[in-house]
Amino acid sequence: MPEKLLKITYQGAGPQKKINAYLRMPSQNYTILRREIELYLFQERQLPKCDVRTFWIDADQDEIEIVNQNDYEIFLAKCESNMHVQVAPLAPIEEPKATKQEGSSANAEAPSVDDPSNFTIHDSVQCDGCGLAPLIGFRYKCVQCSNFDLCQKCESAHKHPEHLMLRMPTNNGPGMVDAWFTGPGLGRRCGRRSRGHCPFQEASQPAPAAEPARDSRRERRHARRHAGVLSQFVEMMTNLPLNTTTATAPAEPQKPKAAEQTESPPQAEPTVTAEKATESEAKPTEPMKVNTDQSVPTTEDPVTTPRSTEPTTPVINLDNLSQIVPPEYMRAGIEILNNFSEMFSKMIDTTDVGDSGIFAPSTTSSAENKKPEEQSQSSGQSAASSASQSAVPSAAPSANQSNVPSANQSATPSISGSISDAQLETEPLNPKPLETTTETEQDRRRSDSLDPEWQLIDNAYSANNSNLINLDTTNPTAAPQQPVRDFGQLGELLRQHMNEEARVEQASANTQTAQVDTVSTSTSTTSVTTNSVGTSPAAPDDKRTVPVYHTDERINQSIHAMMAMGFSNEGAWLTQLLESVQGNIPAALDVMHVSQTRN
């Protein structure tokens, strides 16, 4: 029968390696086993003597302690084929002494934070706050003063709080920090460094003209010695208000531009007097006097005098606008803006309404002015000569003097009997009878800021309309008898027209012609009432005649509908606008809204 052996593994404390050994199988007594293990390890191997514990590792890799005889018998039963006992010391050898030494060393290595023995000693440096010399701990050096240092206690007490302080944790500051802040001149070492072209000194040469006057030799010597880069930077930062005045000095030649901008505020003000407008356009209109004398009538000189104290429509500064907007878009833009400004001024001013409603359409001229109106439309918009431009303003007062008073007496009773229902719907749209003759031509003048070129373009189309909006002529006595505007009727007219447009698109060709006749007869009431202001009531055939603005029937109907709503077709701008959108009134209103918001 082979002899049984017991394997033991001992892992002692300290750097010694693990020891594996075999023992002959001792008796079945656990006490004898412990004695033989201690004899082998501590006497034969001469290992440091200590209390040991015995255990074994089962199949689950768990440590099973062997403490008494019962545990030893279980070990023999479980590990009969492979008996292996693990031996380990209960505690490290001389553990109490080691812990005491480690604790004492830890206390020695981690002293208190406020212990001065842990701080760096800055030799030959004295605290200017408390007089501590040498300075111990963190050294706080003032950046703006020549030689001012504080210890960490004085700095924590917020001494010298008005200047920037630099914290120096180590004692190598005099060689590095002084080169940055104080510059050369601190001794032979600094002199040698400055002779080697110190990079901090090259960019720190101050301009002789910018140097302030030194009062004494001490200040001049201090400036020579302490002329570092950061000291110059600190002086520049502290003297920022002085630097801003010198920086703005060369900007004085630009003051005339600022003065010109302050003299011409019409673009920002909603309402401007004619005096401000003439001042703003005085300079740009001087080189254009030759052209104005040749093309514009001489009646414009007395026009400006009576309007000098009365408010006008908003003025557009074309000097700045012409630099942004191309010239080809200026014409239509000016027409749209002027019409909008006149219409809104008419709607806002309650004392200027009278019996005319919101806006006077362009067909309120007399019978004498109607023939040149048709001739100018047939011959083209841009073919009007300078003679016709000067003749229309001069002929308008005489026509108004002879026709307007008779129209006020005879037009109303004849129309009220025939088309009373239509007159009720279009009451806010009826034109206002003119009361003055001399001020009519004065109000026809455009805003004062327009150049003569734009005035010529407007005068070319002035033959189409002899009456513009009167913003200055008011009748305060007739104010209590003014009818209230009914904007609901305007919306109803627009809705009816949109419904007619929808029906025209869905119906056949025969139905379209029938609806065209219906729309033309409904819109003819407005033209009849406007044409009958300057003339006596005509025959029934004359009332049904409607001026044709476009060959396309749909665009022509749209023009009449928008004129009934208060828009003017002066210069045929409304015809061009509706032609671009194929007679779609909502699309035309959107285009005008977008152009107005952009401007």
Curated annotation (Swiss-Prot):
Residues 3-88 form the PB1 domain. Zn(2+) 2 binds at residues 142, 145, 160, 163. Residues 199-211, 375-411, 511-536 have a biased composition (Low complexity). One of its GO terms (molecular function) is zinc ion binding. Zn(2+) 1 binds at residues 127, 130, 151, 154. Sequence repeats lie at residues 386-393, 399-406, 407-413. A zinc finger (ZZ-type) spans 122-173. Residues 192-225, 245-319, 357-453, 507-544 are annotated as: Disordered. One of its GO terms (cellular component) is amphisome. This is Protein ref(2)P. The gene is ref(2)P.
